[in-house]
A protein has these predicted regions:
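Short periplasmic/luminal acceptor-recognition loop of GT-C membrane glycosyltransferases, typified by
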Residues: 26, 367-474
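Membrane-integral, polyisoprenol-dependent glycosyltransferases
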Residues: 2-351, 376, 407-414, 449-450, ...
């Protein structure tokens, strides 16, 4: 069997790498993606919002019956389509992320193959796919993977415009603008800023920037961008007027970048350094080696190494300078980091499996265990279990003195749960009067000072977990 595999590799290394990459993509990006509940907060509320699109106008997002105008719609459209095709299940909600991630993996392979060889393309695609960031965020249905995929395709296509024949350049540039346009519908202005900065700097350095502004490419691109983006933005403006301009563009585009205090997401300048180090495991040590080699060996003289260095620095640098920071923001920096790391490993080739790799693999397992622990001890699993328990009983569900949790809506489907958002004993008494047989979910930390403590003393404690408790009325 081993001899046949070796012979197949010898006869057709390209096919061997593609088949192996397909198998690894299936294992890393698809297997088990529906085996665990949705993670609060974004994944669960985005899933509910996507499901609700199936019942009203697809232009207008709603969250708990309130207009949600801070995000563009593409992620929600894709997820809603998957839910319509496959039902409202965890795997259906996450499937689009896995598909987009897999396309990005194979696109990365072909770019790497074009630059050096099929082996280099495989190394790069494997590094990009098999790290904590990419695996974890492919398996969580949030906007970042959609944006990362479209941004990566846009930048790759910008690179391909240098390789294709003149007769095919118009198609390549058109594809570039189409991906950028849909990226704008996924994340907004960053889908324009990043490709223009990266491709623009690269073209300036290589003295070929004039091609970008040729009318047959640039004007066609502008028309494509407007055709794709005007309908939704116009519909939103007609529906919500100046409020849409303020919330969508000013507050969540510009304010988020320069004044994140208003959104509670401000972080220090170097915030992403440890975040990316952990997220890029098990390749982080090799990436550091690649950075050292970049300066020590003056690798910036290589056209493509310089391109991916610019690619990484622009994304990592701009996100670091922004006032608002979340760990997932820096996911788009993984593809260029994979290329730079692949260069480093490709040059070492058979010598690369040494101490740093073993240390990195160990660190990755530790990181994954920690991340899994954070997710499953953060309360989401408790809400899922409590909601399912109430769903399978004859009891009505009430949540008390806690924010709206989409995980409850996803798993309690008999009717609408009563949501009491603050510590209001009168509202609790009224809910218990209306529903004689009820179960109540409450945060443990809120119980000691609750004004409804006497009411809870007359209820039965069904389950007490790390973050939440479940009570029920006594017959």
């Amino acid at each position: 069997m081993i001899d046949k595999i070796k012979q197949f590799y010898s006869d057709s290394p390209e096919r061997f790498y593609l088949i192996l990459l397909g198998l690894l993509s299936f294992i890393f990006l698809f297997v088990g993606m529906g085996a665990y509940p949705l993670v609060d907060v974004d994944e669960t509320r985005y899933a509910v919002m996507s499901r609700d699109l199936l019942h009203h106008n697809w232009n207008f997002l709603m969250l708990n019956g309130v207009p949600f105008i801070e995000k563009p719609p593409l992620y929600f459209w894709i997820t809603a389509l998957s839910i319509k095709l496959f039902g409202f299940h965890e795997y259906a909600i996450r499937l689009p992320m896995s598909i987009l991630a897999t396309i990005t993996v194979f696109f990365t392979y072909f770019v790497g193959e074009k630059i050096k060889s099929s082996k280099f393309g495989f190394y790069t695609a494997l590094i990009m796919m098999a790290n904590v960031f990419f695996v974890m965020l492919t398996r969580v249905a949030i906007i970042d993977m959609v944006f990362t995929a479209l941004l990566t395709w846009t930048i790759y296509l910008g690179l391909y415009t240098e390789w294709v024949k003149d007769s095919n350049k118009k198609w390549c540039w058109s594809a570039f603008y189409i991906c950028m346009s849909f990226g704008f519908l996924a994340k907004g202005l960053l889908a324009i800023v990043f490709p223009c900065a990266i491709i623009g700097l690269h073209r300036i350095i290589n003295k070929s920037v004039k091609e970008i502004f040729k009318p047959q490419y640039f004007l066609t691109g502008v028309v494509l961008f407007l055709l794709i983006n005007i309908p939704w933005h116009l519909a939103m403006y007609k529906q919500y007027g100046y409020e849409f301009i303020w919330v969508y563009f000013i507050l969540h585009h510009f304010e988020r970048l320069v004044n994140a205090d208003a959104l509670g997401k401000t972080r220090p300048f170097l915030y992403f350094v440890p975040v990316f180090f952990v997220g890029f495991l098990p390749w982080s040590f090799h990436f550091i080696g690649a950075i050292v080699d970049f300066f020590r060996k003056k690798l910036f003289k290589d056209k493509y190494i310089l391109f991916f260095a610019i690619y990484f620095v622009v994304i990592f640098g701009l996100f670091s300078m922004a006032s608002g920071k979340l760990p997932t923001y820096v996911l788009p920096a993984v593809p260029p980091a994979a290329f730079l790391t692949s260069y480093y490993i490709y040059e070492k080739d058979s010598k690369w499996l040494k101490y740093p790799t073993y240390l990195a693999i160990f660190a990755t397992f530790v990181a994954l265990i920690v991340l899994k622990t954070v997710v499953y001890t953060g309360g989401t699993n408790e809400l899922v279990n409590f909601s399912k328990f109430a769903q399978n009983s004859e009891y009505h569900l009430i949540t008390y003195n806690m924010q709206v949790k989409p995980a409850i809506f996803l798993n309690y489907k008999k009717d609408y749960a009563d949501l009491i958002l603050d510590d209001n004993s009168k509202d609790l008494q009224e809910a218990l009067f209306n529903h004689k047989k009820s179960m109540i979910i409450v945060k443990r930390k809120n119980m000691a000072t609750s004004s409804s403590l006497e009411i809870f003393k007359n209820l039965k404690l069904v389950k007490s977990c790390k973050k939440y408790e479940l009570y029920q009325t006594i017959d």
